[in-house]
Amino acid sequence: MENNTCCGCSQPDLPWAGRGTNLDISGCRFSLYPMDSNFVPIILGALEKTDTSAVWSHSDALSTVYRGRLPYVVDAVEGLFVNAWQPTVHMALEGQFSKGCPGDTDGDSLLTREGPGPNAQTIAGAHFPVLCKLALYPMGVSDYIDRIAEVWHMAEDAGLSPTSVHYATRISGDVQAVFDYLHAVCRHMEQTVPHYILHFTLSVNSPTAE
């Protein structure tokens, strides 16, 4: 049987058979972890402060997902992280950006927004150091390792000091520089591969001595 998707996932007995979208939908699913006794108001307060008018959003007991055009998805995730940041609270955000999944659908998205991201002003005033580890999965291409090397060099060019750790790459820098890099990686992937997943973890104010 001919496989007509980027990952060879077109078998009719699979749960996502018949799905897929040609729309310009990117998404990020993430969970926020403030290591503080007031974690509930930190999480809910950040969700409330963040302007999600440019994306489709949904939260459940495990995570939050934003879906829409890539610049606005990144704007919403960065806005939430900035809104949740507190100078003395250790906090992590774990998530994944993705586009091109053969199991995706046309629904649950917002693609009509134009102009600057609604959280741009909030983001512009934020500056604090962030540690990040990431793992990139370019799907549906045989030269995936070359694509991973490309984004490594992008991190070098951005001054984020990439280093290899087991099963991931680690970078560090100002919050805006880190999110600009994640955005650039996603943009590069959507232009060069049919499907990608970028898994990342952000950490601030870690008590771990290095």
Describe the function of each predicted region.
Residues 2-210:
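Charge-rich, low-complexity N-terminal segments
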